[in-house]
């Protein structure tokens, strides 16, 4: 697992249905750590470019439909709740996700 991977997750709470998510924690984080920071994805796209990153499906990312990374809803989940790897975001999508995450947590102020 590495940053930018698109995986399936089953997180708890309001967004608990299995869905694609992007690994957003650094690759420098120990692989033995019990949890992983992800941003879940949704196919219900909204007009919120500051914190929702729209990603079109490609063979590389493994998505089936246009989706948005919900940078406004990062979650930490137990490693065992991560399912299979679907694909990986391209460099442009990762760069846009970085900007959105910086906006959400106030690093862009």
Sequence positions of predicted segments:
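Conserved functional hotspots at enzyme active or ligand-binding sites that engage polyanionic ligands
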Residues: 1-109
């Amino acid at each position: 697992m590495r940053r930018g991977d698109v995986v399936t997750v089953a997180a708890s709470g309001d967004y608990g249905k299995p869905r694609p998510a992007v690994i957003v924690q650094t690759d420098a984080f120990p692989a033995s750590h019990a949890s992983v920071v992800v941003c879940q994805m949704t196919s219900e796209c909204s007009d919120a470019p500051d914190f929702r990153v729209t990603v079109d499906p490609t063979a590389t990312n493994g998505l089936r439909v246009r989706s948005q990374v919900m940078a406004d809803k990062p979650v930490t989940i137990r490693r065992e709740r991560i399912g299979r790897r679907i694909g990986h975001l391209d460099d442009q999508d990762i760069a846009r996700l970085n900007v959105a995450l910086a906006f959400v947590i106030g690093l862009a102020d």
